[in-house]
Amino acid sequence: METKKTLREGYTTGLCAAAATKAALTALITGQVQTDATIRIPIGRVVTFSLASCSFDGETATASVVKDGGDDPDATHGALIVSTVSWASSPGVHIDGGEGVGRVTKPGLPVPVGEAAINPVPRQMIHEAVNEVLAQYGLHRGVNVVISVPGGEEIAKKTLNPRLGIMGGISILGTRGIVVPFSTAAYRASIVQALQVAKANGCRHVVITTGGRSEKYAMQEYPHLPEEAFIEMGDFVGFTLKQCKRLGIKMVSMVGMMGKFSKVAQGVMMVHSKSAPVDFGFLAALAEQAGASSALVAAVRGANTAAQVGDMMQEAGCMKFFELLCEACCQAALHEVGGGLTVATSIYTMNGQQLGKAVQTDGDDEVDRCGC
C-alpha cells in the first residue's frame, strides 16, 4: 500500500524578513558575523534559519535568508530576502522597503498608499525581532530597517501586485509565518484583497472569472472596465459572490466555461473537479426546455463531460440551451447570496467564442448595465 507523502511547510517572506533583521541587528551590535537566526513565529513555534549572507561595516549590517516555499512554492520561492539595519536618530523601529519591494499606489490594501508593501503582521514580526535583540543587549536606541529583494521587480510580474497597484517589486507577506501547502485560505485571502482594491478604487461592477483564459475573454467583453475590476476566483464561486455582497459591490459578472459553470447552474458553489459531479440529468432537462430533439436530450443525459454537451448543442444549433444555462447560473448566484445584486453570466468556448449570456437583477440596485 502506497504511503501518502506529508507535504513540507515553507516560510513566508515576512518571517524571512524578520529573521534576517534579527541577524543583521545582532551583527551590528556585536561586530560578529552571524550564521543563523532563531525566531518565534506568530503561531508560537520557534524556527532557526540558516543565513545566506551576513556582513557589517560599523555603520550598517546586512543579513539575508533564502525564501523556502516548501512543497507549495509560489513566485517568491528561492528569492533572497535581505535586511539592512542601521542606528536611527529618533526612537523606535523605522521600517521601509528597498530594491525589489513594491510600493503601494492604490487604496484598499492593509498598507497606506505611498508605503512599502510590507504587510502589518510582517511589520509586527520585524518590530518584535528588533526589540528582542535590543533587550538582550540592554540597549534603548532607534533602528532603521530596510527590506530588499534582489530581482523582486521581475518576480512581481508573476504575481497580482501590478493589478493591485503595488509597483516596483513583491510584497512582504504572511500572517502565520508558515506557508501551508496548497492552502485554500491563502487563495481566499487573495480574492478578498483584490475585491477590496476594486471597491476602494470605485468599482461598482466587478468581473469574476475561473481562470486566466476566461479572464482574457472577460476583458475583451468588458473593455470599459479598469484592470482592477477583473478578479480570478478560481473554484471559489460562492465565497467570491458573498464577499462581493459584503463589500457592497452592486454588479457582478461571472465569466467562465462549460465545465465549471454547468456546476454553478446546479447550485454548486465550489467548482473544483472533485467537489461535485456534473448533473447530466439537469443539463438534459435544460436541453429539452431549449427545444432539443429527444435524441439529443438522450445524448446529453449519457454524455461524459459538460464540454461534450456544449459541443453537441453547438453542432445542433441549439443556442437557446446556453442562454438557459447562463440564466440558471445567475439564479443560483442570487440564491447563494440571498439577492441584492445584479448578476451576469457569460459562457465561452476554449477558443473564446461566447456561447451564451444572461443578466438578472434581485434588489433595488441602480447599476448602469449598458456595458453588461
Curated annotation (Swiss-Prot):
Enzyme Commission no: 2.1.1.195
Q: Which GO terms describe its biological process?
A: anaerobic cobalamin biosynthetic process; methylation
Uppermost EC category:
transferase
Reaction catalysed?
Co-precorrin-5B + S-adenosyl-L-methionine = Co-precorrin-6A + S-adenosyl-L-homocysteine
- Supply the Gene3D superfamilies for this chain: CbiD-like
Q: Which protein family is it in?
A: Belongs to the CbiD family.
List the protein's name: Cobalt-precorrin-5B C(1)-methyltransferase
Recorded name of the encoding gene: cbiD
